[in-house]
Amino acid sequence: MELAYLFGSLAEGKGGALSDIDIGVYLSDTLTKADRGRKRIELIGRLMSLLRSDRVDLVLINDVSPVLKFEIIRPNVLLFERDPDLKVDVEQRIMSVYLDWKYYEDRMNQHLLKRIMEKGLT
């Protein structure tokens, strides 16, 4: 494990009694997808035991969409970092890809709204 973040309702101070514990983990790029999957299962088991809860949702940052990656790092609740330089590199890559995606999503939404305003919903 290289990085771990708390995200979701608990990271935003909005968690309740029924909230799950959302944790995003970044694993080494040298691991295969299958190895990352095995590591995820192992980490979930260890976290459930450590936290004495089965309400643990562990997401592998390596394998999720740019939007979810951004949502994981946005609250900036870092639980673990092996290497501060790697953290900076990973977060910069996530932000770059997310901002590129967001730019095009915003343009598509503007175009869609313009068409709706011009032609209506039919």
Across the structure, where does each feature detected by a protein language model lie?
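Catalytic core of pol beta-like nucleotidyltransferases
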Residues: 2-3, 11-17, 33-122
